[in-house]
Amino acid sequence: MNSSEIRKRYLEFFAARGHRVIPSASLIPGNDPTLLWTSAGMVPFKPYFTGVATPEFRRVVTCQKCLRTPDIEMVGRTARHHTFFEMLGNFSFGDYFKERAIPWAWEFVTRDLGLAPEHLWISVYLDDNEAFDHWRGLGVPAERIVRLGRDTNFWEIGVGPCGPCSEVYYDRGPAYGCESASCGPGCDCDRWLEIWNLVFIQYFRNEAGDYSPLESPGIDTGMGLERVASVLQGVNTNFDTDLFRGLIDYTAGVLGVRYGDDPAGDAALKVIADHGRAITFAIADGVLPSNEGRGYVIRRLLRRAVRKALLLGREKPFLEGVALAVIEQMAGAYPELETARDSVRKVVRFEEERFRQTLTQGNEIIGRLIAEARAEKRSTLEGAAAFQLYDTYGFPLELTREICAEQGLAVDEAGFEAALKAQQQKARSSRRETRYVEERETFFRNLRDEIGLTRFVGYEQLEADAGVRALIRDGQRVPAAGSGEQVSLVVDTTPCYAESGGQVGDHGLIEGENVRGRITDTFAPVEGLHVHEVVVEAGVLEEGARIRILVDGSRRRKICRNHTATHLLHRTLKAVLGTHVNQAGSLVAPERLRFDFTHIQPLSEAELAEVESRINEIVLSNLRVESFQTSFDRARELGAVALFGEKYGDLVRVVQIDGVSMELCGGTHVLSTAEIGPVKITAESSVGAGLRRLEAVTGMEALAFLNSRNEQLHRIAQAVRVPVSELVVHVERLLDHQKKLQRENEQLQDRLQVYEVKELLDRASTHEGVRILATSVRARDMAELRSMLDLLRERLGSAVIVLGSAVNGKVSLVASVSRDLVARGLHAGAIIKEAAAVAGGGGGGRPEMAQAGGKNPEKLTEALEKARQVVLRRVDGGSA
């Protein structure tokens, strides 16, 4: 039975028994920033089991895509370790319990899957007699029902719902056993294969560790598709099922190897297939490779897959093809893969090419470090060196560890951690600031508990009467503030929007019987409490007074234009670049907007033009902009976009742009897109690995930007004395002329270099038959220095050459040793390492060629003399 048929039969079996078939949730847990991945079938339903939310359906069935990485090093080594896997599960939220879950499980595995009852064993929790009796009632012999302890057969996650488990095991026969007297279900050997786990959620554990029965117990089951497929397809490992074998065979063909010929090669192919599935599904769900969080996990998996291919001799990019093979195989069950096809291809291709560049640079360095360690008879790579590879070249520690292990070396991980901690010390000031923020938050939380929440009425009106509830200055409450004083104001009702979700806070005015003031900012230090920064301009502002608050309407309208434009930008970027685009941050201010989003490379001019054009088309369409409140689950069902990492309550606000965009958003917006006016993108930049930033202006600010650019064009045209219409052609001619002059200059420099080389040849000396040249030269950069070295090597033949130059306050050194002298024990890397140390630097390289740098130009002459002395010492019989 193939995996598609197993998946189909499971869903249909429980659908026929009143279960609602729910599509798989994203690998990114919705509305739960505490979880990195959806790692189990129950994760999407966690709020229902914990009582945080009320389920729409009391019986559901799913095939949930899951991702786990704690045992990443075991993938490919064992029969069943995976990063990405599928979990079949049926769930009851206060509906049926053991009396149905157990008979249905038995019916499905014996009838629908056709597994022989004599091969099935059952485990129950030690004192779960109820489950034991249900299994016995189905005809399972008592000797094939084993009672296991809390470690394996009791599910709990700290405080909250919990309960005993019952597992279905498939007995593969004595040939797969460990021959231990205690061998049975629960044993770690390969005989007993757990294929289904039924969790009976019937207790609540409190903070004291006490358990009480739940009024409405529930069911949470999980059947690993890969495991049950291995049983039904009669194969020894999950990797030999149809879920993996096609990918493995495809990869083997691309790499030019055969699966089954070599255990090490087979393990590498398994890793590539497993990791290829994980990265394809994760990228399709919106995760981009980066240096932190989920992005780091995906980057690590992708790089491990590439490394395994390199070990099999693959030098060219290949992983894009593996990802497409995953899509071809799995899109029938997960249509989001087809939707994200182009995004997955682009991301995988870009990341692999980028990593191969990193590998080229890093492998050269780590190869040198390993050679040095061996030369010095060390069995460990220094932690500081491993950290430099990580910090400077983006070389992950685990990759350094793997490469070193292949060469029989360990990595000083304690030293690595020490170097990492030393770098983290630089962040102490930010941690002090964090403590200050925490103390400030505690103050305002206590204030909120005392005076109550602020009622926000700013969606409907820009003016409101309010009562002054508190005045704060320098972290302390004060009874009043006089003219010229600045104070933080808390009221019971306000039309002022507090800074949130990237939108800046409102400005405005306050008016009272004896007071007038100006609001310069509005923020919410804790949820539900609006704080207004006020400068009192006349009279006295007192606690308990009644005032009127007036929002700066002109400023608010500009903010609304930019906020709605931000939603349009988000939607348009997804349409133009791909579904992998997700918001990563924003700033919505009156004069401009800024939008950070997930994308792996700079936008081309054509892409920027298309994004801008599409947004302005929507603006001109005069589409209606509406907002409404609904439950979080209902909003997601409607297709509303939620920001990853954000925590939402049960009731959320949805902003909908007719037929174009729907997002969860608490900000203020225009009523129709035509109010936005022209939208102009002003800048595009990088803000980190896998993150891009767009900046834009709207309305009159967009017009002012265009006018400014037009004025600049006219000024440039006047300066070069051509009409604006001819400016591009004229600049192109100037650039061509500049390139011609640059080429002529380089030719002159080359001629000068040849003359200088002739002069340098006379500086060479001979000692014991070895020609030595250690001298300073004029060179603009390291490339020119190496060029001079190459010319001298050709002219001198058998020789040791060390050249140095001082440019921009730094020392550059290069060295070469001819092959015949390498055979005599001279080593360019060793020579230059000692010389660079004199100039306050370091470096190294191969025996024949090396380079280094230094911080002290005044030590250049001394460093070159040191190099000459090292050569003389070696020639005279010392060490080089």
UniProtKB/Swiss-Prot annotation:
**Location in the cell:** Cytoplasm
Location (main, coarse): cytoplasm
PROSITE patterns with a match to the protein in the record: AA_TRNA_LIGASE_II_ALA
Q: What is this protein called?
A: Alanine--tRNA ligase
Protein family membership? Belongs to the class-II aminoacyl-tRNA synthetase family.
Q: Which organism is it from?
A: Desulforudis audaxviator (strain MP104C)
Keywords for this protein? Aminoacyl-tRNA synthetase, ATP-binding, Cytoplasm, Ligase, Metal-binding, Nucleotide-binding, Protein biosynthesis, RNA-binding, tRNA-binding, Zinc
A Gene Ontology molecular function term of the record: zinc ion binding
Q: What does this protein do?
A: Catalyzes the attachment of alanine to tRNA(Ala) in a two-step reaction: alanine is first activated by ATP to form Ala-AMP and then transferred to the acceptor end of tRNA(Ala). Also edits incorrectly charged Ser-tRNA(Ala) and Gly-tRNA(Ala) via its editing domain.
Q: Which Pfam families match?
A: DHHA1, tRNA-synt_2c, tRNA_SAD
